[in-house]
Amino acid sequence: MVTKNNLMRSILSIIALFSCCTLAAQEYIPTYGREPMRGELLVYPSAREAAEADGSDNKYFKHLNEWTQKGNSFTTDFTVPFAWANRQVLFRLGWASADYEIRVNGEAVAYNSDCNAPAEFNLTRHAKEGRNTLEVILSSPSKVERLESWKNDASPAIGAAWVMSQPTLRIRDILTKTWRSTEEGDNVMAEVGLVVKSEALNPRTSRVHYELLSPAGKTSATGYKDIKLNMRGEDTLRF
């Protein structure tokens, strides 16, 4: 038999539970300062090095392997060389064990509330030529985290990370589509889309050269296309 007092206690417990959840929800920080999602894209100084594609450090690409951890904070240094002048400085982090804030030289520049997916951040306006300090600060666990997820508390951790430099007019993403065409002699066909982004403050017309290589390293197609972008514009070239 349920008494009136027991029923009231149950109702008050439910109200208290939802109040805790509401307070936790109010602590949510939305993502800001993150680049649009894209596939993994590496930068090489020359077509020859790009064809080798071994993923090692080069003139415009540096892995960040040495981090100093203090609690929920991971800190490292990176250098912006003179060769990166008038170019974009991008930071990519593969994953983290919690949502995180990005700080450059002590300044908060971005926040990512989707810690499980790779994310990129444009640090161009915040990094200076020479040595810079980069900090990834993981958020503290929510007080009602156990109510929100079945996962156990994870130790603070971050995934693979690197910084790279791209030109002011850059390839932001690469989209591919392949299919087998019986109309073309049972050949495998491919369509490639290059998402081109301009960070310039004035309209620009540029020519994009391309070379498609087969898995065996042989040239399958070459050519170029012209593209005109307005101030900080973006468009897709299809080959």
Residue ranges with predicted function:
Residues M1-E27:
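Bacterial Sec-dependent N-terminal signal peptides
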Residues Q26-T68:
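Hydrophobic alpha-helical membrane-insertion signals
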Residues E27-L42, K70-D173, S198-E199:
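Accessory beta-strand-rich segments of carbohydrate-active enzymes
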Residues A47, G106-A108, P167, S214-K218:
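Solvent-exposed strand-loop boundary residues in beta-sheet-rich modules
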Residues E66, Y111, T222-Y224:
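Residue-level detector of high-confidence beta-strand sites
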Residues G71, E129-G130, G185-N187, N230-E234:
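Solvent-exposed, conformationally flexible loop/turn segments
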Residues I102-V104, N187-L229, D235-F239:
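Beta-strand-rich binding/interaction modules
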Residues T178-V188:
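Short, solvent-exposed loop/linker segments at the N-terminal edge
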